[in-house]
Regions:
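Helix N-cap/coil-helix junction residues
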Residues: 136, 198, 251-252, 264
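Flexible, small-/acidic-enriched active-site or ligand-binding loops
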Residues: 211-258
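Aromatic-enriched alpha-helical interface/lid elements that frame and gate functional surfaces
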Residues: 104-179, 183
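A glycine-rich dinucleotide-binding beta-alpha-beta segment and adjacent secondary-structure elements
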Residues: 178-230
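Active-site-adjacent "lid/gating" segments in soluble enzymes
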Residues: 1-115, 120
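Short linear loop/turn motifs
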Residues: 141-152, 157, 187-194, 255-265
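Conserved active-site and cofactor/substrate-binding residues in soluble primary-metabolism enzymes
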Residues: 17, 34, 43-47, 121-125, ...
Length: 265
């Protein structure tokens, strides 16, 4: 934040995760490791964008501008709304796998060492669909209610792990789909471009940089009237747009010549 006891301290992604409680929910055991993308950086940026948009809407209505501020700490706390609400209701900090148990989410490794993500949520039909897909009707009697599946999550997870380890992923996928189980095979980032849904939605595109050739990037995730195309210029080289920015700031051609001769730009 702009003030307070931490205001003068440097902050990066992992600092934001540690300060906001996120880091405690993503590691366990005696050998904790940092994993995943820079969540704090992305979340703070998203909330900043929302704040700017809100200020622009207000300005259009009132003619008054706003100073928009976002701290990484507050942004990450806001994004943790679900576990935070649970903690406030129960007085207990969520365990590492608390959300997985409540949402009935599982990651299972198949015989070929490829993984599947399952999320059964609340509807009973998804649990029954999973039981039918893996041909284990005995589990209906062993775990008759959702409350029992939540309470005995570790035991159920171990059973599912044993079942899925018996066949390759290609065996399980059509069975899960046929029984309408919420699942997806675990994708690596380098596999995304080959995913049929990703291809259908036209997620990735290529642009040509004048010096560095073809570059691949992802379109924006928002569609306007069905269109998600991004009209972005290629990433600039160091200093490529400095003169353009300075001209927009009001510097004259003569001012730019002086700066260029002095080696400033």
């Amino acid at each position: 934040g702009a003030s307070g006891p931490y205001a003068s301290r440097p902050a990066y992604d992992n600092v934001g995760q540690a300060a906001s409680g996120w880091l405690s929910m993503f590691h366990a055991g005696a050998d904790p490791k940092v994993a995943g993308p820079a969540v704090s950086d992305a979340v703070a940026g998203l909330y900043a964008a929302l704040g700017v948009l809100g200020a622009l809407v207000e300005r259009a209505q009132t003619g008054r501008g706003r100073k928009v501020e976002v701290s990484m700490l507050e942004a990450m706390i806001a994004m943790a709304c679900e576990p935070l609400a649970a903690m406030m209701a129960t007085g207990q900090a969520p365990s590492l796998y608390g959300r997985a148990a409540m949402s009935q989410s599982y990651v299972v490794t198949c015989r070929d060492q490829r993984r599947i993500g399952l999320h059964l949520s609340s509807p009973e039909k998804f649990w029954r669909g999973l039981v039918a897909a893996i041909e284990r009707p005995d589990l209906l009697a062993a775990y008759p209610t959702r409350a029992e599946r939540v309470e005995r999550y570790p035991a159920l997870a171990a059973t599912l792990a044993e079942v899925f380890a018996g066949q390759d992923r290609d065996y399980w996928e059509p069975r899960l789909e046929r029984h309408d189980v919420p699942f997806m095979p675990e994708r690596r980032l380098d596999e995304l471009a080959d995913d049929p849904q990703v291809q259908h939605q036209g997620v990735f595109y290529e642009q040509v940089h004048p010096r560095h050739g073809a570059l691949r990037a992802a379109h924006r995730p928002v569609r306007y009237d069905g269109d998600n195309r991004s009209d972005f210029r290629p990433p600039p080289d160091l200093g490529e747009h400095t003169a353009e920015v300075l001209r927009e700031a009001g510097l004259s051609a003569q001012d730019l010549d002086i700066l260029q001769q002095a080696g400033v730009v």
